[in-house]
Amino acid sequence: MQDRKPQQIARELALLSLSQLPLNPKKLTEEHLPKLVLATVRTLRAEVQDTLDNAAAELQRSNDRLLTSQTRASDLNTARNMLQEAISYTQTAINQLGASVEFPELIQLANQDKEVGRYAIKLVKIINEERSVIDEQITSALVDWQVTRLAQIDRDILRIAVAEMMFFNLPNSVAINEAVELAKRYSGDEGHRFINGVLRRVSDQKKALSV
């Protein structure tokens, strides 16, 4: 793991924790964070296994179609599309697995630096308490799409970035760059480009309102 600033580690912990929140996030304390992250590790491992299984199934389907298809263009195109889907599944699994092997060190760093825990908890609380406002901002920047239809990991990355823009006074460019880096680690192959595009529209809208 490359050396990272406390807020970068906290941001990652917050991302991983959003899907593991207790019923009442307001009761979340620094003492609860390690347990929250450990629960997240177990969930991510299960997701990685599911993704690997899906990738294996898609690769097998692609291989079968390539072996059995005729030379007709439609069959070859179908086989090619299936193979591309399989590659996408595999890439997502590799990204998730690569991130999960760093969790032990991530937890250790979080335990050593109190700022990490405080910032992660603050992020999670703000996102929970201001979710409707944050989601409204995201929705306004989506093109023919809804927040609820986004993949959970992409939705949570966007929420973290918008929360930092709106409530932490983090410069828009910094929030966008940090979100893109998170997307490269946890989202699909094209996830970081999608995240970048949405957040740049959010930034443009905020600038327009401030004029």
Curated annotation (Swiss-Prot):
Task: Please list the GO terms describing molecular function.
Answer: RNA binding
This entry carries the following GO cellular component terms, namely: cytosol
Q: Which CDD domains match?
A: Terminator_NusB
SUPFAM superfamilies according to UniProt: NusB-like
Pfam families associated with the record: NusB
Keywords for this entry?
RNA-binding, Transcription, Transcription antitermination, Transcription regulation
GO BP: any one term: DNA-templated transcription termination
Q: Which NCBIfam families match?
A: nusB
State the PANTHER family in the record: ANTITERMINATION NUSB DOMAIN-CONTAINING PROTEIN, N UTILIZATION SUBSTANCE PROTEIN B-RELATED
Assigned protein family: Belongs to the NusB family.
Give a short account of what the protein does. Answer: Involved in transcription antitermination. Required for transcription of ribosomal RNA (rRNA) genes. Binds specifically to the boxA antiterminator sequence of the ribosomal RNA (rrn) operons.
Protein known as? Transcription antitermination protein NusB
Q: What is the native source organism of this protein? A: Nostoc sp. (strain PCC 7120 / SAG 25.82 / UTEX 2576)
From which lineage does this chain's organism come?
Answer: Bacteria, Bacillati, Cyanobacteriota, Cyanophyceae, Nostocales
**Gene encoding the protein:** nusB
